[in-house]
Amino acid sequence: MDISVVIPLFNEAESLPERFAWIERVMKENGFSYEVIFVNDGSTDGSWNVICELNKKSDHVKGIKFRRNYGKSPALYCGFEQAQGDVVITMDADMQDSPDEIPGLYRMIKEEGYDLVSGYKQKRYDPISKTLPTKLFNATARKISGIKNLHDFNCGLKAYRKAVVKNIEVYGEMHRYIPYLAKNAGFNKIGEKVVQHQARKYGASKFMGLNRFVNGYLDLLTLWFLSTFGKKPMHVFGFLGSIMFFIGFVAAFCIGADKLWCLANHIPQRLVTDSPYFYLALTMMIIGTQLFLTGFLGDLISRSSTNRNDYQIEETI
């Protein structure tokens, strides 16, 4: 199979027939063998009924229904697990991503040898309340990830070599930074293609609000930390813990040595426990020990942890 199109969705019933018809036309015009995987992420507006109707009309349509809304990352990951095509295309269901871009994205993967190609919505039809934070996000993501040639990390329209989606785990809210996940997995040939951005035709965006932007930055910092220290938590926690314990131990030793010297020379000296420095040294030793144990436990957890996605599938077609 040439192409798998993975479409995560939440309450997009109005747009689904038009979305599939557009994809179907592009696929037929270019002679691609394909499948379209709709991942219904807990929709409450009848989206699943529409997907079932599309499935009855076309063997190319597959559907996955979650028991509740889990988020875009688990929906994408579930679609990736089911995808069979040599090239996997992701796009949103809201008609803002153009299926006419599929042939160009496919060629960049198959003929130019890219592992991942991300769309770049150079001209956007979003309000400034969304575009301005997006620019800040992308600038920060480029800096932290080291992927200098991408301008739109969160673009829903992307193309992947099949091996990429089978070797990354998209969990939490990490869908924004899939190129970073791919790079960390060893897929370094990452490209970009300027794509059309359509104005939303049906409904309103489900992803507005301050929390979206705050969570985006927190996710990026989490991803940086995990990619740097995730395999060896002891490297960071053990190091910090050892430094703090050593400083506390040296301070306590000096306080004790000073007390013994004063006793040996019959110099009046208050009790060690009366000194605030003693408690400061003790606190540093305790915190150092806790950090060291945190690193140890982190190592154990990282070795025993497996899949971090806990979504439940209610039905598949």
Which residues make up each language-model segment?
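Short, well-formed alpha-helical segments that are part of the catalytic scaffolds
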Residues: 12-27
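A conserved acidic beta->alpha catalytic loop
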Residues: 40-49, 95-96
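Short beta-strand/loop segment that forms part of the nucleotide-sugar
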Residues: 32-43, 64-65
